[in-house]
């Protein structure tokens, strides 16, 4: 996708273009990548274009997921400012990789059936469709995310009052209140 957009925007060939395929965390990782590239080079500006078309990845008859995933896009322009940094904390949770997964996604299973099947949770989908274990994602969000935010503020020697907003990537109102 990055190279397609590079062509459509008629960008110079000296302009780097690459994809970061990380789903929910792609924006945070991409912002850190752009920040690091700018801090360690003569790059003065970076354009981050994020987009998801998850409606294509969820089976329309999978009632457990179809209402949770949507499509969206945004573009953010980064500009180098002397003595200013974009700080962040990147984390991964490999133990929970099965909580949101397209079982036949990527190149893991090269010849799965494309036929929709009825799964044990009572929902219909193919092995190519994204599936989410809502209970596991909820548990992770309630247990780990607040601790990560606290750890980050300790690392940066800040408090909640330091920030104008905390913007969370979560559709669940109950989780936001936690």
Describe the residue ranges of each PLM region.
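Condensing-enzyme catalytic core mediating Claisen C-C bond formation in acyl metabolism
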Residues: 62-139, 143, 147
